[in-house]
Regions:
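A short aromatic-anchored loop/beta-hairpin motif
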Residues: 27-96, 100-105, 197, 201, ...
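C-terminal subregion of chymotrypsin/trypsin-like serine protease catalytic domains
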Residues: 261-262, 275-277, 292-306, 319, ...
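Serine endopeptidase catalytic core focused on the charge-relay Asp
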Residues: 157-395, 404
Length: 483
């Protein structure tokens, strides 16, 4: 039995078609790089060339990853040491400001995204990243993106040649000098991700791209989603470790305090772990990636993203699909306070099986889909029809299916509209009647009696010991918790 983490590979769908306009990634201020406004076009510095990649080797590794139940991969991590001190070019501007630019080329890449081991911007400084032809821009990133551990990640730029541009106004430099404070920017890149899966849809290519999920999948905008409009807004596509993707969902808690908690699958974590390695500040989360049409399938918006988080709880054995395969993450950037139209899904830790259920997910990195099971779920161990009820078994989908990339997505009780689990894996696909298994939120509540709060969900989803369930809310900040 394999997890929903590979088979019909491709990340292409993740960020859709390339538009000839500025786009933003993570929480950012938008706008355009400083150099774009200069009267005379200034040449970018010569690019730092990345080594070539071995596609055959990567595809062989991808097959092994599938067997191991890892999340699907779209890019190859290239280790580097590029920063504002050892790379790029600084120049002083006529107004006294400063500009730093670094050019990176990964020949043949479908996209490039970056991971940072030290990222800090002073107030007033702004960073943009753009394709060398200036057709795709992300940013601007500011001090609002600084993290306590100074780890950061930026989203995909659809080109094999990108430019980083950091602008520091004269007043920022003057303030630093006047206060005698060494508040210098630090932009240190430790990984360049060479995207080797197609991103733009080309019907003549055999490699799948946008619209790559099976034809039986149903867009959430279709009538099947009419009773689930709120819950649909809770589901998010995530980039784990900068080079793989899964699905997750924003979840409410009994304190109803707008805390940005996200549930996904443990096997999506890679080496991250609540105890030994809790930071996932290299992760990126894409909200509201949904088709505006039922049919034909149309790409959705890709500009609502946040980055970073901390693993609060998982069952241990990083990357394992067994136990109940849960992972709870606290997001570093709250999509609600960023102004995104999101929903905090309700949950239910009951061990009583729902009589019917609905799943919402991003199959093969595609726009959001909805799947329906009209029969009762059963509590079983993973991959079985009986055993310790660590999982909910979906016998076969009556509408839609799940695929690689759907891992970590929620399954909701039709009766209560509360989430009851997160997808681990299974054999379901268009054209078959094979089962799927979702990690049970009820089992994960105590995780078989785990003593450490980092190995169970109840300490975080019910911090006051109030209840084992809560309804969803678009704005739980203003809701009075149950007595």
């Amino acid at each position: 039995m394999t997890s929903k983490s590979l088979t019909h590979l491709v990340f292409g769908v993740l960020f859709g078609c390339l538009f000839l306009q500025t786009a933003m990634a993570q929480i950012s201020i938008g706008g355009k790089p400083y150099s774009f406004a200069l009267r005379t076009h200034t040449m970018s510095p010569p690019p730092v060339l990345m080594p070539g990649i071995n596609i055959g080797k990567l595809e062989a590794e991808d097959l092994l990853d599938e067997q191991a139940g890892l999340a699907p991969r779209f890019g190859d991590l290239i280790e580097v040491s590029l920063n504002t001190n050892n790379s790029g070019v600084w120049e002083t501007l006529p107004d006294g400001g400063r500009l730093w630019r670094l050019s990176i080329m990964a020949a043949g890449a479908k996209s490039i995204n970056l991971l940072y081991d030290d990222f800090y911007l002073p107030d007033g400084g702004v960073l943009y990243i753009y394709s060398a032809d200036r057709k795709h821009v992300i940013g601007g990133f500011t001090s609002a993106n600084n993290k306590a551990d100074r780890i950061f990640a930026t989203g995909l730029v659809y080109s094999d040649h990108i430019v980083l541009e950091y602008y520091e106004p004269a007043e920022v430099i003057a303030k630093r000098a006047a206060n005698n404070v060494a508040e210098e920017a630090s932009i240190s890149i430790n990984y360049v991700v060479h995207g080797y899966r197609f991103i733009e849809f080309n019907p003549n290519d055999l490699v799948k791209a946008f619209g790559s999920s099976g034809s039986c999948n149903v867009n959430t905008i279709c009538s099947q989603g009419d009773n689930w409009r709120d819950q649909i807004k809770s589901v998010v596509m995530l980039l784990s470790g900068g080079s793989r993707f899964c699905t997750g969902y924003l979840v409410n808690n009994t304190a109803q305090d707008c805390r940005p908690l996200l549930l996904t699958a443990n096997h999506c974590l890679g080496t991250a772990d609540a105890i030994s390695s809790p930071s996932v500040n290299t992760w990126t989360f894409m909200w509201r990636y949904e088709s505006p049409n039922c049919t034909p399938n149309t790409d959705g918006p890709t500009n609502m993203t946040t980055s970073g988080g901390t693993v609060l709880a998982n069952p241990g054995s990083p990357g394992s699909i067994f136990s109940s395969d849960f992972a709870l993450i606290e997001l570093a950037e709250n999509p609600k306070t960023a102004g995104y139209d999101v929903y905090f899904a309700g949950f239910d830790a009951t061990t009583t099986a729902p009589s019917s259920a609905t799943g919402i997910h991003h199959p093969s990195g595609d726009v959001k889909k909805i799947s329906m099971e009209n029969a009762a779920l059963t509590g079983t161990s993973y991959g079985n029809t009986s055993g310790t009820a660590t999982h909910w078994r979906v016998a076969d989908w009556d509408s839609g299916t799940t695929e690689p990339g759907s891992s970590g997505s929620p399954i909701f009780s039709d009766a209560t509209k509360r989430a009851m689990g997160f997808l681990s894996g299974g054999g379901a696909a268009c054209g078959n009647d094979l089962p799927d298994w979702y990690g049970s939120l009820g089992y994960s509540w105590t995780n078989g009696g785990a003593s450490d709060s980092r190995r169970r969900l109840n300490a975080h989803l019910d911090p006051g010991g109030l209840a084992t369930f809560v309804d969803g809310s678009a704005n739980p900040c203003n809701v009075t918790p149950p007595a």
